[in-house]
């Protein structure tokens, strides 16, 4: 069968193992061809090709529901569910999404982008199914990294309490998340990968016992009891953990043996109640470079398939904000042993891997456990440690109660560095960092700031670490502005003090963080129309520099705020609230992300669609204030 001609995953039914293996080869070929050209997640999907094929061969996907955790591993799913011919548009504007979207396909039953949600969603569907008296299978496919997340363990705890609710959890154990997973559970899983599989008493044996004359029916309960006893002896330690939580455990199964996988999934479907099938896979399977460097090939920009090397950018770029942060933190840690960097399984993305290599004793990776990371930092701060929690803006949302309850209310000196703040591009709505300005500015005792460039980032990092209270700074994805960097001798900024960059009498533009340089460019465009602008780099949103901003607003009489975040409760809202509270009544235009989801596209395309380029912002300003 040609994969390009497959119109429905049910067409896998009845194919011989050799034919399914050929489909697997075609999936890998298409996967590699597209990701090498346009970028995307590589290793996770390559590792679950056989798992996906075998699972789908045992299901009726017109009715059965499969929930994929995170979405990194769902490219084979997409190729088998009608998106083969559109797959060249992966992660491109109006193309196939890199993650799961309910609006994209009837086979995407639950959206995903963050980890550890699949078991909860699948269990919810299973409970709904049973309440409605319907009959279909609910399956969650979750990686061993995502299984370390508290939400996944909460769902397992609940599912195990429902012995009459059929639910299949497929544990895709590749001994990795983005980077190697951490924690006791990961250690147990690694031990299990090398254990012999648990063997199950076959249905035929059970049927034979049932058919014994006189004693068959009476022996059924004894048979079940014996089976349970044998299983408790046979199931290795981590399997016993799941068994004690109420799951029937099967595995570990070779995740690249379609025949063995198919037999195991068919057996699992017959059990009833919650079942855990433990599948051992190899991340990056089938592409030697990805198998050899599973961290580096988790996700890739475009690369040469033959050599495995990334295709370099045509124009040199300054170091990323993330890299500058990581390098600066290493130097600060060298000077102060009380500083500790904390990540939640995102060492490479946040550049804390630089600290991990340089000073491992001052580095902590908690795994996919954002809530724990925040409160852990709070506990450290209570004892005189200076924790720096580096975390993506979108992932810090998962620990909002901890920010308020454990850090803000107690006024603990913890530094939060929010990476990927603002528009992130091809990862789409689940990963846009558009909400942190709003959700941070209302937390008690927090000081919140954003640098205009990488030099100011260095100063703000020092400001946060030296501040005797909770603080947060946001940095965007991608390259810096090319500002000169200091190797040492950084000084703290005056908290709550803005920077006036340009002076003009016709318009006040206040930029926050990554929007300061676009504000400067916008002012230059407006100057061509005779509009002279005062441009202020706000630096801080909490506290806001009311003295500087109020004076300029009253003097000039026309105000524009610019932010790379949602307008709802954002930076512009803070400025307008401050004006209102102080009886300053001036026309104000707030520019930022409106009340809408930002879909996957390049960052530049997203900014164009939102009207956030300097040219488009200049047009908005001219229309608002009649500058013609």
From Swiss-Prot:
Gene3D superfamilies: 3.40.50.920, 3.40.50.970. Thiamine diphosphate binds at residues 72, 113-115, 145-146, 174, 287, 370. InterPro entries: Dxylulose-5-P_synthase, THDP-binding, Transketo_C/PFOR_II, Transketolase-like_Pyr-bd, Transketolase_BS, Transketolase_C, Transketolase_CS. Binds 1 Mg(2+) ion per subunit. Mg(2+) binds at residues 144, 174. Belongs to the transketolase family. DXPS subfamily. HAMAP family: DXP_synth. This is 1-deoxy-D-xylulose-5-phosphate synthase. The gene is dxs.
